[in-house]
Amino acid sequence: MKVLPASGLAVFLIMALKFSTAAPSLVAASPRTWRNNYRLAQAYLDKYYTNKEGHQIGEMVARGSNSMIRKIKELQAFFGLQVTGKLDQTTMNVIKKPRCGVPDVANYRLFPGEPKWKKNTLTYRISKYTPSMSSVEVDKAVEMALQAWSSAVPLSFVRINSGEADIMISFENGDHGDSYPFDGPRGTLAHAFAPGEGLGGDTHFDNAEKWTMGTNGFNLFTVAAHEFGHALGLAHSTDPSALMYPTYKYKNPYGFHLPKDDVKGIQALYGPRKVFLGKPTLPHAPHHKPSIPDLCDSSSSFDAVTMLGKELLLFKDRIFWRRQVHLRTGIRPSTITSSFPQLMSNVDAAYEVAERGTAYFFKGPHYWITRGFQMQGPPRTIYDFGFPRHVQQIDAAVYLREPQKTLFFVGDEYYSYDERKRKMEKDYPKNTEEEFSGVNGQIDAAVELNGYIYFFSGPKTYKYDTEKEDVVSVVKSSSWIGC
């Protein structure tokens, strides 16, 4: 891992080139394809393998082919390719990959010394948001990206909501006043300035891009974490597994740990984070497991309830209970992290579509898909379902098998989602108490069993008959786990 060779206003960019990732061999390519690839290579090498004070794009040919061959060899060596000096297919594939725009050679020497922050507590402020994501999602992505670095070094990040912060974060369009204009979708994704006064540390994202916390677009956590590495003083790494490797590669925000190479680099600047051990403890002290909530208390409630295969799962805080529907024995608690490590804790809502063999777990503005207890890919945004942007989380969800529709409860209202059409139905949301006679209070969880909908609201569970359209019985929620 390299640290930046100079302090001051060195700017860095992440780029997604406007070309496909596959490239034919230049030897076998048509004249037009050859010319296009050659121009692309010229532009790439001029941008990433030429001093900033040197020639601009388009001057490389006039300087002779030897200069270009040297730069091709530099590129091949950096990425661990066979060093031939030729624009072969493997080299062109690298050139066409989305990447960070900071050069792979040391170009920025505005001030002597390695740029780093001279204090351990840094402030940050998000001054402008993107329409691609909710403000809650953006806040979370930024927070997690900064935590990735603070976990390794003695730096703390404090968010402020007004005034000038050390790291100013914003989503900008086109020319936004820092001499590094954005160029629209799939061009430059973001840029950040090295530690220092003024623009130092500031990080800008192209507002024209589709930002996401998943994979359907550019993952904000991935780009932000990489850019914050530059904002803290790191240059690129030649280790393909490193966060600071030049090319864009999705990183799952949940459970992310800073790779070893990045840890070495950031600790070279700031030193390791010291762990306060506190008072000595007795040898072999037992590990304290999360306490199991006392759901036999008269005021107990559940966060989420769903079927998963042949079992009924009931969630509360960091614990969930597994039971057979028709048995009151063998009910056992488990920690959420032991079976669903990506969820970590506190599930807001859950439901299963048995015909597909998939279940959906909701937490804040995100949801996860499972097959049994196996997670299927990274988290996705709840706005995939068609929720309006003011909806920040789901309180409860229940899948109705006969109409193949899922009801989502938010506050005192509910939405209806058509699972066959994969589309939110019109004329929703509707008031829950007006539509479900006898059900009172906000819905915490819901599940359909044997033609009945069971609504969990605080310490009560309402058994709702869909044919009679009325509640037929009310029991204590705690009775579901044998209390």
From Swiss-Prot:
The EC number(s) this enzyme carries: 3.4.24.-
Keyword Calcium: yes
GO MF annotations, alphabetized: metalloendopeptidase activity; zinc ion binding
Cell location: Secreted, Extracellular space, Extracellular matrix
Signal peptide boundaries: 1-22
Propeptide: 23-107
BP term (GO), one: extracellular matrix disassembly
Tissues in which the UniProt entry reports expression: Expressed specifically in the enamel organ.
Cofactor(s) named in the record: Zn(2+); Ca(2+)
Major subcellular location class: secreted
SS bond partners: 296-483
Hemopexin repeats by residue range: 293-343, 344-389, 391-439, 440-483
Motif (Cysteine switch): 98-105
Keywords: Amelogenesis imperfecta, Autocatalytic cleavage, Calcium, Disulfide bond, Extracellular matrix, Hydrolase, Metal-binding, Metalloprotease, Protease, Repeat, Secreted, Signal, Zinc, Zymogen
Catalytic site: 227
Chain positions recorded as Zn(2+) 1 binding sites: 100, 226, 230, 236
CDD domains tied to this protein: HX (cd00094), ZnMc_MMP (cd04278)
Matching InterPro entries: Hemopexin-like_dom (IPR000585), Hemopexin-like_dom_sf (IPR036375), Hemopexin-like_repeat (IPR018487), M10A_MMP (IPR033739), MetalloPept_cat_dom_sf (IPR024079), Pept_M10_metallopeptidase (IPR001818), Pept_M10A (IPR021190), Pept_M10A_Zn_BS (IPR021158)
Pfam entry (one): Peptidase_M10
Claim: Zinc is one of the keywords in the record: yes
Residues bound to Ca(2+) 1: 164-166, 197-198, 200, 202
Associated pathology: Amelogenesis imperfecta, hypomaturation type, 2A2: A defect of enamel formation. The disorder involves both primary and secondary dentitions. The teeth have a shiny agar jelly appearance and the enamel is softer than normal. Brown pigment is present in middle layers of enamel.
Protein name: Matrix metalloproteinase-20
Lineage of origin: Eukaryota, Metazoa, Chordata, Craniata, Vertebrata
